[in-house]
Amino acid sequence: MMRSLATAFAFGTVLPMPAGGRGPMGRGAMTALPVVGLALGALAAAVAWGGTVVFGRSSPLGGLLAVAALLLITRGLHIDGVADTADGLGCYGPPDRARAVMRDGSTGPFGVAAVVVVVMAQALAFSALAAGRPVPVGVAVAVFAGRVAAVLACRRTVPAAAGSSLGAAVAGSQPATVAAAWVAVLLGMSLVAGPRPWHGPVAVLLGLGCGAVLVRHCVRRFGGISGDVLGAAIELTATVSAVALAALVRV
């Protein structure tokens, strides 16, 4: 278990991990990925809260700095998946052509637009959540939800896209019991994410639903999941969860 956890942190962050204590990304590391999400969520929440202290509750800078911190510590791994997946989905061609577009090193207009929307939406939502609560648990929950979405995307019956090494390593690797357990943990944590107990669960379920729809569409479009698809699902789920929660706390 510790080896899988170290592998998950090595994959999902820039934190140094002993080479002998980690292995290749696979089933165990994917199962442990939500733990990385908890750590990243705590970091984002702390930065967003610090931003409200320094710049005031009405400033969006705290949320923007929280997103910047996440991008730095994850080396932009998942946001790159957003860009590549958006470009692939915007390609009018057969699956092999769409996969080739995703593997291309350049970023097209769809990718640029998707990244801008995701970064700005997360930044503004994180700022709103940090301003509305003494402790911005909602920020941490949204980031955590994104990594739970990755586990759901790797559940049994979900295939890997042709040519994707990461997809081949993790697609179909997560039993339903593991996915259900992480969703249960997420829902439990989300109960304290908003002023009312139902705010958090509604927000994260909406986020997970959007992530699942994206994954399903990508499976049809690309023939399966890849590392880029997982990154896009993570970021979409986190973004929708944060935006939905920011809206619900005002109800």
Curated annotation (Swiss-Prot):
Provide this UniProt record's keywords sorted from A to Z.
Answer: Cell membrane, Cobalamin biosynthesis, Magnesium, Membrane, Transferase, Transmembrane, Transmembrane helix
Primary localisation category:
membrane
Which Pfam families does the record associate with it?
Answer: CobS (PF02654)
The subcellular localization recorded is:
Cell membrane
Q: Which GO terms describe its molecular function?
A: adenosylcobinamide-GDP ribazoletransferase activity; cobalamin 5'-phosphate synthase activity
Residue ranges of the TM segments:
35-55, 59-79, 110-130, 134-154, 175-195, 199-219, 229-249
Q: Which cysteines are joined by disulfide bonds?
A: none
**Topology with regard to the membrane?**
Multi-pass membrane protein
Needs which cofactor?
Mg(2+)
Q: Name one GO biological process term.
A: cobalamin biosynthetic process
Give the metabolic or biological pathway.
Cofactor biosynthesis; adenosylcobalamin biosynthesis; adenosylcobalamin from cob(II)yrinate a,c-diamide: step 7/7
Q: Which InterPro entries match?
A: CobS
Entry EC number(s): 2.7.8.26
Name the reaction it catalyses.
alpha-ribazole + adenosylcob(III)inamide-GDP = adenosylcob(III)alamin + GMP + H(+); alpha-ribazole 5'-phosphate + adenosylcob(III)inamide-GDP = adenosylcob(III)alamin 5'-phosphate + GMP + H(+)
Cellular component, GO annotation: plasma membrane
Q: What class of enzyme is it?
A: transferase
What function does this protein fulfil?
Joins adenosylcobinamide-GDP and alpha-ribazole to generate adenosylcobalamin (Ado-cobalamin). Also synthesizes adenosylcobalamin 5'-phosphate from adenosylcobinamide-GDP and alpha-ribazole 5'-phosphate.
Q: Which family does it belong to?
A: Belongs to the CobS family.
State the name under which the record lists this protein.
Answer: Adenosylcobinamide-GDP ribazoletransferase
